[in-house]
Swiss-Prot record:
Function comment: Gastrin stimulates the stomach mucosa to produce and secrete hydrochloric acid and the pancreas to secrete its digestive enzymes. It also stimulates smooth muscle contraction and increases blood circulation and water secretion in the stomach and intestine.
Presence of the UniProt keyword Secreted in the record: yes
Keyword hit for Nucleotidyltransferase: no
Origin organism lineage: Eukaryota, Metazoa, Chordata, Craniata, Vertebrata
Organism: Chinchilla chinchilla
Family, as annotated: Belongs to the gastrin/cholecystokinin family.
Compartments reported by the entry: Secreted
Sulfotyrosine: modified positions: 28
Assigned keywords, A-Z: Amidation, Cleavage on pair of basic residues, Hormone, Pyrrolidone carboxylic acid, Secreted, Sulfation
Cystines in this chain: none
Name of protein: Gastrin
GO MF terms, alphabetically ordered: hormone activity
Listed PANTHER family: GASTRIN
Length: 33
């Protein structure tokens, strides 16, 4: 389920980023990617 930003899925993109990036985001805080 790791697609190179193929289909324009904003909702899914956010969910995906909140998964693997959740740890980094929590560590940095300012990183809102």
């Amino acid at each position: 389920e790791l697609e190179p930003q193929g289909p324009p899925h904003l909702g899914t993109d956010l969910s995906k980023k909140q998964g693997p990036w959740a740890e980094e985001e929590a560590a940095y805080g300012w990183m809102d990617f």
